[in-house]
Amino acid sequence: MSAALFSLDGPARGAPWPAEPAPFYEPGRAGKPGRGAEPGALGEPGAAAPAMYDDESAIDFSAYIDSMAAVPTLELCHDELFADLFNSNHKAGGAGPLELLPGGPARPLGPGPAAPRLLKREPDWGDGDAPGSLLPAQVAACAQTVVSLAAAGQPTPPTSPEPPRSSPRQTPAPGPAREKSAGKRGPDRGSPEYRQRRERNNIAVRKSRDKAKRRNQEMQQKLVELSAENEKLHQRVEQLTRDLAGLRQFFKQLPSPPFLPAAGTADCR
């Protein structure tokens, strides 16, 4: 009769554990509707509670909502795990020490009756990845992201440099000072100083032109000299060629002595 009072799809009534839907099947017998109920499959709430929740863990999604509402800056991280850890560290001071029962959720130790409070089961951490070492780094990264986004939202200053402020020294001086500054532009064209400057400039231009002309004349003179020397060399080569041809003709006309071979076999070349 006790087994008929509990619904397999609804929460258990009068149970000491939290009122949440939980499967009451054993791990090895789930998904086998053909087999009949065996003794010990469904037990009384008080007697079977420790053995029923050995391989199960309850997940409370309200912790994620509370943590994101309490710490809005962590929304930029898109990391619910670190947000939940951050919220649990802030609430650890007022929650008090917790006692982990072997068959049920953690309950706070303290005077007076207290309602059972769920404790979310965290994933296993490795030896090198401790929650205490990763959480400060993540919080610092989130803070840097918030600062960078806040700075990006502010209007940027203009890149062009502002014109320098006018100082008292740069203000135009009245009277003779203004006339003096105006006189620095140059002497009058009819003044003798202007004529002297023009004459000096003309002399410098003439000297540079004369120097360029002299260089051009020197190069032309060298070109003429080299051309004449080249012509002489060509004439010398032609003279030597004619002398060689005359010597060959002379040696061909010489009579052959008796102790020398015939002229047809001997070649002066």
From Swiss-Prot:
Q: Where is this region: Disordered?
A: 1-48, 97-133, 151-219
Q: Which GO terms describe its biological process?
A: fat cell differentiation; hematopoietic progenitor cell differentiation; inner ear development; integrated stress response signaling; negative regulation of DNA-templated transcription; positive regulation of osteoblast differentiation; regulation of cell differentiation; regulation of transcription by RNA polymerase II
Q: Where does the record place the region Leucine-zipper? A: 226-254
GO: which molecular function terms? DNA-binding transcription activator activity, RNA polymerase II-specific; DNA-binding transcription factor activity, RNA polymerase II-specific; identical protein binding; RNA polymerase II cis-regulatory region sequence-specific DNA binding; sequence-specific double-stranded DNA binding
Span list, region Basic motif: 195-222
UniProt lists compositionally biased (Low complexity) regions at: 36-48, 97-107
A single Gene Ontology CC annotation of this entry is: nucleus
Pfam families in the cross-refs: bZIP_2
Q: Which SMART domains match?
A: BRLZ (SM00338)
Entry keywords, A to Z: Acetylation, Activator, DNA-binding, Isopeptide bond, Nucleus, Transcription, Transcription regulation, Ubl conjugation
Q: Which residues carry this modification: N-acetylserine?
A: 2
PROSITE patterns from the UniProt entry = BZIP (PS50217)
Q: Which family does it belong to?
A: Belongs to the bZIP family. C/EBP subfamily.
How this chain assembles, per its entry, is: Binds DNA as a homodimer and as a heterodimer. Can form stable heterodimers with CEBPB. Can form stable heterodimers with CEBPA and CEBPE. Directly interacts with SPI1/PU.1; this interaction does not affect DNA-binding properties of each partner. Interacts with PRDM16.
Descriptive protein name: CCAAT/enhancer-binding protein delta
- Classification lineage: Eukaryota, Metazoa, Chordata, Craniata, Vertebrata
